[in-house]
Amino acid sequence: MNENLFRPQFDTLKLSDKLWLMQTLATRYHLTFKELYAFSRWGQSCTTGLFEKGGREFVFVPGDTVILGWESFVQGMDKANQEELADIFAEIEYEGSAEEFLRQGMTPVRQVTIAPMFVGRKLEEIGWESVPMNDPRITAHPDWLENLQKWAGQNSQSFEIHETVRFERNGDSWRAWLCHPMTYPEFQRSLLWELAASLPTPDEWAYLCGGGCRTLFPWGDGLDHKMKLHHFENGEDQGKPYDMEQPNFFGLSIAYDPYKRELVDGKTLTTCGGDGGCNVCGGMGPLLGY
């Protein structure tokens, strides 16, 4: 494989050479090349190509040989994170160390080689189709709209009929989604047939999130409590973007909401990232929630 597609060489290419490489890849894989863009976040950076296909935006992520997994702190936690963990340990009567506790939920340390790839820049919700409120498939069910009016009168922000339809308040109006349930194998096949794409493996997902960093989070060994985080907003955060949802050093919006399980490739249904909100809903706080 072309060594220029791997990060050590890719990062040293002249912009003119990188531009030619990206245009060549776009032609080969039937993508529309948009531009070169420099992404920088949390001490890592990558100037790479942005592409488009079928209304989706993709980014080229160079490959690399990296260390994944976690077993111990590199920098150590600050006082705020230590105190948050100590309170939780006292509540659950845990007497071991923070590293021992966290290690239980981590994959083992290993060296892996990740191949270069095109990656969709944003998470996509599976099985839900965004539709206008006047879509015939919505208006054909006046009972849905009647129930929605009842919920709206109670100042509710959302209304969902299981595996059928979902409505969410959008300012003074509402947005609608229709549900199209599918199995994990069906989704994998649809990716292959419709996009000639696949889900990332768990190792690829970890690389896309952390780039091979050795700290607990991409920015360090503790949660930055100055960040605006989903499910832990306060009044001062109004109008600000969610920090972890902003593009990372590869230009990806990934692993930013503990309520969202992110599908990865496996023989059976496999997810990374969020736990469906179990820790957050269970009162474990932002650190263990994320």
Positions of PLM-derived features:
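Functional-site microenvironments in short loops/helix caps that host divalent-cation chemistry
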Residues: R166-G285
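Extended beta-strand/loop cores of jelly-roll/beta-sandwich
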Residues: M1-S198
